[in-house]
From Swiss-Prot:
Cystine pairs: none
Annotated positions binding ATP: 146-153
Organism the protein comes from: Trypanosoma brucei brucei
Motif stretch (DEAD box): 255-258
Taxonomic superkingdom: Eukaryota
Catalytic activity: ATP + H2O = ADP + phosphate + H(+)
Name of this chain's protein: Putative DEAD-box RNA helicase HEL64
Molecular-function annotations in GO: ATP binding; ATP hydrolysis activity; RNA binding; RNA helicase activity
Location of the motif Q motif: 102-130
Gene label: HEL64
Region of interest: Disordered: 1-34
């Protein structure tokens, strides 16, 4: 046991140092069993200031109908027209007009911030930035729903820096003023990197994440930061051992909130929010707007405004040309070799589902004479950072990645994405596409798909056709045929029924001679129940998990999957 000093309690404590300084928990962190609820009525809090820009002043400036930048914001009529042109939908009352020009920030944000933005050759704010800035600068909570590569990082970070400028200075032992939660360490590092491009020398930004030694990260927190970017698991670890307090946090950001919930971080996020003062300003950004995110927003935010850039339906970037190659599993490597030859002069990212597949493709690409490296969850953090840094700098390097790199990573000038495996979830499909065609650029996305992959995930195939239609992409004839051959019934995966339409106290439907429940809820002692299924014909496949898994299409000419028997 190592004796360490806590800068917040002033007491000596014991800290169990694990592998690589990671402590006893993995990168997901524990559940914070030792974190106690805060009685905010008995806590002395530093007063916060959330209204950088008065909302009434914004509306008043919007009424001035002149085109000069000094006039401030757009008029109500101009704002409505601008939102229609950029397909922005507003949900909420008293939403301020967008800031369609950097000139609208004059006199509102610190002067250094405008200089930093113009130094990066930005000509105008992106649509999500233009609408989110006035909302956040007026102190309102925000939910932003926008596709990847739309400039969301600066969408919440520019108001955060203006927010810091009007707060009381940090004192020794204070925690951060701004906390940004990200689902993956790669995204957390990217947010930190983008933030450091626009902060001055007297504002400090730090990043803590799992998979890296805790010692340097604890030293960073001990010195003090204004902005902390963190993954939920690692922040829970530090809260659990009382190495950080969040009482000075007045601005909280949940980036890629849908991804955090998909990865099972909801308990950690709830614990962290419980340690942050209730009068905070809360910002959520997400690529989708599922029911879980709606529930989270209603719970964590007050009088919030939701802005949606584009359709609320899941959609792919229209700037990316999508191409599908129908193949068989044994021929995938041959198709990959042809694609690599076709895109030899471009930066290429290859996605696959399995870690062992990524390592195998890395070796195969090197045998073919390509410089290739693989990145996945089994790689150490320093290896992943090295590979990503080299991929950004070297256009000749081919990167093979699992879905750990599918969201949030911003690779400049990535022309081509090749999907070696078809994803199991439609969200992963869209976010793989989002790695190319960023910031208004064009890109190409190629999918190698087999009939077996499409049959295992028939619901994904149906959603895929809808995404292709909304992105104005060509739909292959065979995809339309497969979708038409799908069974007309669907399994209703009700909660409390283990997802297979059975009561928890009832036995599984393993064959036609086991008791089951019918669609109208009647108990059957002889099986053949159709609970969870719509009405079907006499020649339809009886309900069972194996019947659905091995359902065959009329056009399927592949062999039936072999079932191997293993000795017990």
């Amino acid at each position: 046991m190592e004796e360490t000093y806590s800068p917040f309690t002033g007491r000596q404590g014991q800290y169990n140092q694990g592998y690589n300084g990671g402590g006893r928990r993995d990168s997901r962190g524990g559940m914070g069993e030792r974190i106690k609820p805060v009685d905010w009525g008995n806590v002395s809090l530093v007063p916060g200031n959330w209204k950088v820009l008065d909302g009434k002043a914004i509306k008043k400036a919007g009424e001035i109908k002149t085109s000069t930048p000094e006039a401030g914001q757009l008029s109500e009529e101009e704002a409505t027209k601008w939102r229609e042109e950029h397909v922005i939908t507003i949900f909420g009352d008293d939403c301020p007009p967008p800031m369609s020009s950097f000139d609208h920030l004059c006199g509102i944000v610190p002067p250094y911030l405008l200089k930093k933005l113009t130094a990066q050759n930005f000509t105008a704010p992106t649509p999500v930035q233009a609408q989110s800035w006035p909302v956040l600068l007026s102190g309102r909570d925000l939910v932003g729903v926008a596709k990847t590569g739309s400039g969301k990082t600066l969408g919440f970070m520019v108001p955060a820096l203006a927010h810091i400028a009007v707060q009381e200075p940090l004192r020794s032992g204070d925690g951060p003023m701004v906390v940004v939660l990200a689902p993956t360490r790669e995204l957390a590092q990217q947010i930190e990197e983008e933030t450091k491009k626009v902060i001055p020398g007297d504002v400090y930004c730090g990043c803590v994440y799992g998979g890296a030694p805790k010692g340097p990260q604890l030293g960073l927190l001990r010195r003090g930061v204004h902005i902390l970017v963190a993954t939920p698991g690692r922040l829970i670890d530090f809260l659990d051992i009382k190495r950080i307090n969040l009482h000075r946090v007045t601005y909280l950001v949940l980036d890629e909130a849908d991804r955090m919930l998909d990865m099972g971080f909801e308990p950690q996020v709830r614990k962290i929010c419980g340690q942050i003062r209730p009068d905070r300003q809360t910002v959520m950004f997400s690529a989708t707007w599922p029911r879980e995110i709606q529930r989270l927003a209603a719970e964590f935010q007050k009088q919030w405004i939701r802005i949606s850039v584009g359709s609320t339906e899941l959609q792919a970037n229209k700037d990316v040309t999508q191409r599908f190659i129908l193949t068989q599993e044994f021929a995938k490597q041959d198709e990959l070799r042809k694609l690599m030859q076709e895109h030899r002069e471009e930066r290429v990212l290859v996605f696959c589902k399995m870690k062992r597949t990524a390592d195998e493709l890395e070796r195969q690409l090197r045998r073919w004479g390509y410089d290739a490296m693989a990145i996945h969850g089994d790689k150490e953090q320093r290896q992943r950072e090295f590979i990503l840094a080299r991929f950004r700098k070297d256009p000749r390097l081919c990167l093979v990645a699992t879905d750990v790199a599918a969201r949030g990573l911003d690779i400049k000038q990535l022309e081509t994405v090749i999907n070696y495996d078809f994803p199991m979830q439609i969200d992963d499909y869209v976010h793989r596409i989002g790695r190319t065609g960023r910031a208004g650029g064009e890109g190409r996305c190629v999918y190698l798909i087999t009939k077996k992959e499409a049959q295992i995930t028939p619901s994904v195939l149906k959603e895929l056709i809808g995404i292709l239609e909304r992105a104005q992409q060509e739909i292959p004839d065979w995809m339309i045929e497969w979708n038409a051959q799908q069974p007309r019934y669907q399994v209703k995966r009700n909660r409390g029924m283990n997802g297979f339409g059975r009561h928890q106290s009832a036995p599984f439907l393993r064959n036609g001679h086991r008791p089951s429940f019918s669609a109208n809820g009647n108990y059957s002692a002889h099986g053949n129940g159709t609970f969870g299924l719509g009405k079907h014909n006499d020649d339809a496949v009886p309900f069972s998990s194996s019947a659905i898994q091995y359902k065959r299409f009329d056009s399927d000419d592949e062999a039936e999957p072999s079932r191997k028997k293993y000795a017990r």
